[in-house]
Structure formats: C-alpha cells, structure tokens
Regions:
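N-terminal Rossmann-like FAD-binding beta1-loop-alpha1 element of flavoenzymes
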Residues: 11-38
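Dinucleotide-binding Rossmann-like beta1-alpha1 core, especially the glycine-rich loop
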Residues: 52-141
C-alpha cells in the first residue's frame, strides 16, 4: 500500500446510540478490523431506557454472531432465545388468511425446472395442496418439532434453515460485552450538538452533556427514530 492510500485510511469511528443496532455495528467492525489502528467509540446514555421486546430474526443472524466467535448455544443461553423455522404472515391475502414463509426450500427441482412450476401446474389441474406442504421446515413448524439441519448437502434434512426469536435488550447486552472485550470504548453521555466541517458539511465532532467533545472520521447513527446525526 502506498503512502497516499495509508493517509486516507479511516482511523476513528464514532457510533451514536447503543441498543442492538449500535452494539452489533461496534462488535462487527471491531472484529473485522481487529489488529488495525482503527479506534471505535460508542456513545450512549444510560438515562435513555431500552425496551426488552422480542426480536424476530432470519437465518443470517446466525452467520453474524458466529463470525464474532459465538455459538448458537452461547446466544440462546444469554438471550433466552427459542428456535424459529419461518415467519407467519396473517391477513395478507384477505382478512383471516394466513401463510407460513419457511426458511429453506420448497420441494425438489426436477430436470432443471424449479419446483414451484410443478406445483403451479398441479394447481391448474385441480390439486389443492398448499406449497407449504412441500416444505420440511414448514412441516416441522406446524408439528411443533425441531431438529438441526444436516450439513450434508445430499441429505433430505439439509433443505431447511432456522433462526432465533430472542430478547432484543439481552442480545444488545451480549453484543456490548463482545464489543467491549474486543476493545470498543463506551462513553455514557447525551449528545448536545453536532459539529459540521464548513468546507463540505461532513460531521467533524459531537459535543456531550459532560462538556467533552468527541472527534471522529466516520460517524454511524444508531440512535433510532431520534436520528441525532441524520436528521
């Protein structure tokens, strides 16, 4: 890397807001740039409470926390999570209607033709089977059952995936623990002013209610609906 490229590298990131978004961003960035000179600071106020709601995730959440060095059991124990095989949509087609969108495949492609074409053909011929009946994940969910998918691609048990339903506040707490253990700095304060660079309007620093000013090269707004930086 030449000197010009090195001089253009971002060396300080300031994340405004904690919660799941803020601490996930902090933990992920710290992990990705581990060993680099990048300094990550997260600013949040303990005076602003969080709501411990249930968080409905999709399977990619498991890739996310596994990249942080956490196992499924680590996260489930820390957040009281339960296994999730899909998402149910109520009243989408019409009032009283419902369908389950499972994580995984429907049926089996045949002769290079995607399975849903065969299902639509059956529908046209009068078959009343719902497409969910051809999904292992949907069938497991309907029966209140769960098993780990097979890691062997040819296996019929490899065609579905799963995620977690967890407590958002507990997951944020876990992400904070991971981030701080990796070196992220936390500042407990409220932001009173956002200072912009006159030459281009980019954020230069933020003033805190403690009287301190925090400078940064990249600012990430995770303050939710308040939009402290983006509004």
């Amino acid at each position: 890397m030449d000197q010009a490229a090195q001089d253009n590298r971002i060396r300080s990131v300031v994340i405004v807001g904690g919660g799941t978004a803020g601490w996930m961003a902090a933990a992920s960035l710290q992990r990705h740039f581990q060993g680099s000179p990048l300094k990550i600071t997260l600013i949040e106020s303990s005076e602003i409470g969080t709501i411990g709601v249930g968080e409905a995730t999709i399977p990619t959440i498991r890739n996310f926390y596994q990249n942080l060095g956490l196992s499924d059991l680590d996260v489930m124990r820390a957040t009281g999570a339960t296994c999730k095989l899909g998402i149910r949509f109520n009243d989408w087609l019409k009032p009283g209607s419902s369908f389950l969108h499972p994580f995984g495949l429907f049926g089996q492609d045949l002769r290079g033709v995607p399975f849903h074409h065969y299902w639509l053909r059956l529908k046209a011929l009068g078959d009343e089977s719902e497409i969910g009946e051809y999904s292992l994940g949907a069938s497991l969910a309907k029966g209140g059952k769960f098993t780990q998918p097979s890691r062997n691609p040819p296996s019929s048990l490899s065609v579905f995936d799963w995620a977690l339903h967890l407590d958002a506040s507990l997951f944020a707490k876990l992400m904070r623990q991971v981030a701080e253990n990796a070196g992220v700095k936390r500042i407990d304060a409220r932001i009173t002013r956002v200072n912009l660079r006159p030459e281009d309007g980019f954020i230069a620093s933020v003033d805190l209610d403690t009287g301190a000013t925090v400078e940064g090269e990249l600012f990430i707004d995770c303050s939710g609906f308040r939009g402290l930086l983006i509004e």
